[in-house]
Amino acid sequence: MKLTGKQTWVFEHPIFVNSAGTAAGPKEKDGPLGSLFDKTYDEMHCNQKSWEMAERQLMEDAVNVALQKNNLTKDDIDLLLAGDLLNQNVTANYVARHLKIPFLCMFGACSTSMETVAVASALVDGGFAKRALAATSSHNATAERQFRYPTEYGGQKPDTATSTVTGSGAVVISQTPGDIQITSATVGKVSDLGITDPFDMGSAMAPAAADTIKQHFKDLNRTADDYDLILTGDLSGVGSPIVKDILKEDGYPVGTKHDDCGLLIYTPDQQVFAGGSGCACSAVVTYSHIFKQLREGKLNRVFVVATGALLSPTMIQQKETIPTIAHGVVFERAGGAS
């Protein structure tokens, strides 16, 4: 791996996604991508006795599917990189307890999907792991209880709010050739433009996404024309227009090349306010829908920029603003991009 420009890692060895697993809840199952998820549930408890245990079940499902697709067992994995939204990364920690794989716990809020993939790819490229597993998850009810109001409270929300995706995604990464190659990653910087409203994460995260996309273009001397798709994680209906406006004003227009996972996972009639959000939003959309399009040749090169609001309820109560970050990874159809 070599650092190119200021923030972009270009992998010196071919790094591949060997398999991916996704698990999702009932609302995600009923959405436009529902048929693409490997495992789905008809109710939010996922056959468990608490929301937190349900989220844990989702991550275990995604991990198990990713391993099974590649005819692997947990003993074939050298390193697990995982994280979630809950305090102390409790979902990832308990899944790691069960798997007993060497474990790096990671937190980047909703940017964790691409953060884990980027670091896993770097470690595989550097020879520190032959085969790594990257996973993340979120659950609507656990996130609401921790960051906003418990679902039982019935608090009203503004139109700028998003709906946290209930689901999990996991990928196996190695130098073993596969259909999808990971060629580079751009590590984001923390941005904070003074947003304090926990019900408007799209506006808060858009500047971080724009900053990472601009830096990626600068570092690799590229433009949006070099990509079939530039996909943000969960800016949804509020943040997506903002990031396009920022990039256009700064001379890096993305136009119709841009889309957002939070706009793809649900339909407007599903009562999701501005769209989807959460760690699982970018993970389940990318690891199912986007990977399928890459394998089928409908896409050749995609830049996935997972966006995260580093939101702390404690700091918000102390009148602090919300810092945000975005990490990006380039996925290419093996042999398909020039």
Swiss-Prot record:
Keywords: Sporulation. Disulfide bonds: none annotated. GO terms for cellular component: plasma membrane; spore wall. SUPFAM superfamilies: Thiolase-like. One of its GO terms (biological process) is sporulation resulting in formation of a cellular spore. GO terms for molecular function: acyltransferase activity. InterPro entries: SpoVAD, SpoVAD_sf, Thiolase-like. It comes from the Bacteria. NCBIfam families: PRK08304.1, PRK12404.1, spore_V_AD. This is Stage V sporulation protein AD. It comes from Bacillus subtilis (strain 168). The gene is spoVAD.
